[in-house]
Amino acid sequence: MFRKLGSSGSLWKPKNPHSLEYLKYLQGVLTKNEKVTENNKKILVEALRAIAEILIWGDQNDASVFDFFLERQMLLYFLKIMEQGNTPLNVQLLQTLNILFENIRHETSLYFLLSNNHVNSIISHKFDLQNDEIMAYYISFLKTLSFKLNPATIHFFFNETTEEFPLLVEVLKLYNWNESMVRIAVRNILLNIVRVQDDSMIIFAIKHTKEYLSELIDSLVGLSLEMDTFVRSAENVLANRERLRGKVDDLIDLIHYIGELLDVEAVAESLSILVTTRYLSPLLLSSISPRRDNHSLLLTPISALFFFSEFLLIVRHHETIYTFLSSFLFDTQNTLTTHWIRHNEKYCLEPITLSSPTGEYVNEDHVFFDFLLEAFDSSQADDSKAFYGLMLIYSMFQNNADVGELLSAANFPVLKESTTTSLAQQNLARLRIASTSSISKRTRAITEIGVEATEEDEIFHDVPEEQTLEDLVDDVLVDTENSAISDPEPKNVESESRSRFQSAVDELPPPSTSGCDGRLFDALSSIIKAVGTDDNRIRPITLELACLVIRQILMTVDDEKVHTSLTKLCFEVRLKLLSSIGQYVNGENLFLEWFEDEYAEFEVNHVNFDIIGHEMLLPPAATPLSNLLLHKRLPSGFEERIRTQIVFYLHIRKLERDLTGEGDTELPVRVLNSDQEPVAIGDCINLHNSDLLSCTVVPQQLCSLGKPGDRLARFLVTDRLQLILVEPDSRKAGWAIVRFVGLLQDTTINGDSTDSKVLHVVVEGQPSRIKKRHPVLTAKFIFDDHIRCMAAKQRLTKGRQTARGLKLQAICSALGVPRIDPATMTSSPRMNPFRIVKGCAPGSVRKTVSTSSSSSQGRPGHYSANLRSASRNAGMIPDDPTQPSSSSERRS
């Protein structure tokens, strides 16, 4: 049953490693090897590992294991091993203790381990912390112990009589360690300590953490200044954005940690004072007011607004937020009494010494709030200040510190608890009732299905964490539209929806007026107005955020004058944008793709400050080489300018419809008066009256048809809008099963240079909120002869032109622009005045005289019929390869 352990004299090792006898054997190993040597080092390492394993087993299966462990005081052997300073054994010992305390589940077992003072002795032991491996296991061990702290266990660590708390004392020595992993662990340990409800321990902790909390806020100041210095000099390129993201992540993590500490009542008061007097006032507020001392360290206004916004989005402590916002909204610059300066390569907080009279600043009321309003000045070089000013207003709405009364006192629109179920719901219902009831009757149009049926089945679930009123503003339409699609009788849905919302309006009390600073409304309106100018520097994300903030204000302000003036402004700006983009609807062959892509992008909510806040700190990029999406940068070139104006138009149009309560039945664009249901994969269709073309389809990529290289016998059939591949139904003569369906408008057809019987066909999928435009079918269509190939190409080409024409007609109807036949157009607003003419000598050119109608100038919504040359950007399909001569055919 036993076998002798060769190096341990009379010790015999049991076969069962999970037994009390095995622990007794291990205790004997430790007893026989109290002095560490090179010969027994490996034995001790294995013994420590085995002890942790058997103690975890005993915790769950046999209480006598812990009884024996405590009776023989085996932790004392651990201390003796540690005191000998052998690094490998110390590493193994710390790892053993960490595993042991991590896996103990029963409180009784935990109490047994903590019942003597050996754990505190291990915590206080002077390990070689310069060794990275020891430091990693040591800080992990301390962190594991901190998670075991509670009112019942705290007195195993804290001795109230002698005022000894080794865990806290040793951790505080590491708060400024050079490795970020250690600093983060220290923060977590201290947070776990101060969360324990024990009065005597809290008094001790507050006394010993004063310096730490002060250093914590100073590190926040240092991170802010360091990041601001980087932002001042860095270009907006991918590498710099990655570096900036790391700096922002560190700063936001620190703000989150401070916010969690502020939620702990024991340290909230002292920490709140430190945050206000060392960070918020001397750094942030000083940076958004006129400079009063040349030695002051100030942030750029953009950085200050960003940090201010992040602080409001994260921190929920009422006293801190209340103090900060009251200073921001009401105080003068005279309240700033300290500032940060640099002294001997260090940051120091000192009182402000005024070298000259400051009367022009001292008596200026609301200097900080006035700065916020000035951030929306459209004459600035870029929209960075405007974006972060909007972010600040948005964060005020989102903050959970219950400061609504303070904001109301400053004529800042805010939802009060008493009005949440009255005015907010009333304005929401009034804004949306007309659009909801009218859109609820929309059925799914043939061009809206795109080619979802051709892709792999995917289910996307959006589960919002919290449904807020601003979310409801955007979601009412979606919910009602989805119910209309699923209901076979849309009329019933419309009546039910209208009656539901109408009854909600009838039951609401009369509206109450909520005050709004007129200057704030004018400042926000200036962004809308700037969008209508040709030389504006507004990015789409800024306009999107502005529309969101305006909607939030309209939820609380029931002022008819405000609604009327904003509606009028949106109408004027929409007409200006329409006059700019409307002339390209008929003149640009790719306008259809531009509009559909930007509408899909428009439906995506980009206002997510977890991923966009830091990117806007750098100077605005104006080139695709920056790797930024278009909505986050300035446009470059003709196409991007038109795309940006399309997005502007969509946002202004949506805001205007929300203000007037009109339903938008034209968007998303769809072909009107469709006389047939869209075909989907798996449908069985009647082909008695259809013209079929037999072909072999060879996919070039994985798709719904099959794998690349498969040869599939299919029949090609088209309708007005769709390309359909079918397989005959063996059960019904004249019927077929749909195997693929795509939109003709997104189909590209090319001949093959080596085989006249082959067509190369690419069908792209419609863009959506989830996916960009992408090919869903790339395949070769092989026909029996080149005549059938030519017939198929002609049919697909004509079908593509017809489908695109119908879709463009729908876009024109949605925009209110007359549809013009491309064959009648003679000029384009951006046409190159020179073109190569066939038949000319090489290198010679003839100037094309561009003519345009001037009769329609100055009339909004009216556009010239002579927009562009029919040869410019026509939807041409490459010619077929040259066919073999008749003699060669006879030879073959």
From Swiss-Prot:
Instruction: State whether keyword Transferase applies.
Output: no
Q: Where does the FPL domain lie?
A: 48-194
Q: Where is this region: Disordered?
A: 844-892
- Return the Low complexity bias intervals: 844-856
* Keyword annotations from UniProtKB, A to Z: Autophagy
Q: Which GO terms describe its cellular component?
A: Golgi apparatus
A GO BP entry? regulation of autophagosome maturation
Q: Biased-composition ranges for Polar residues?
A: 882-892
Family according to the record = Belongs to the CLEC16A/gop-1 family.
**What functional role does this protein have?**
Regulator of mitophagy.
Tell me the protein's name.
Answer: Protein CLEC16A homolog
